[in-house]
């Protein structure tokens, strides 16, 4: 009985001091170290570096829309190798990890979708800066249609 309680006590002690990270993509310093890094903007991308990376193959920006799987977004894969997390785009939309990327477009690391909440309030500035809202919406629909019918470009090494 005494041996069992000592073994249990030792096991509890080892578990309390164990700080191993069992997730394959843990940041340097462990799971909680990501909270210590200040938030930074994601890498610039696209024509003239006017956009921001939203995922390893997604580049979006004001006045240019989104590039998904194209050469303009190829540099975004480098974001995966940086040690600190980044924050892209405007406010949260769609899923919990989605962000407003352009007027009417919500993106997360996996892809983009049309989201009407991204055309309200903060994103209304994008529309007023570019063209009239009805023309901007037509252009957005054409761009999303092209993206959905175009196979992703592959970067050859």
From Swiss-Prot:
GO terms assigned for molecular function: neurohypophyseal hormone activity
Residues that bear Glycine amide: 29
Cystines in this chain: 21-26, 42-86, 45-59, 53-76, 60-66, 93-106, 100-118, 107-112
Keyword Signal applies: yes
Purpose of the protein: Isotocin causes contraction of smooth muscles.
Similarity comment: family membership: Belongs to the vasopressin/oxytocin family.
Protein name per Swiss-Prot or TrEMBL: Isotocin-neurophysin IT 1
Organism: Oncorhynchus keta (Chum salmon)
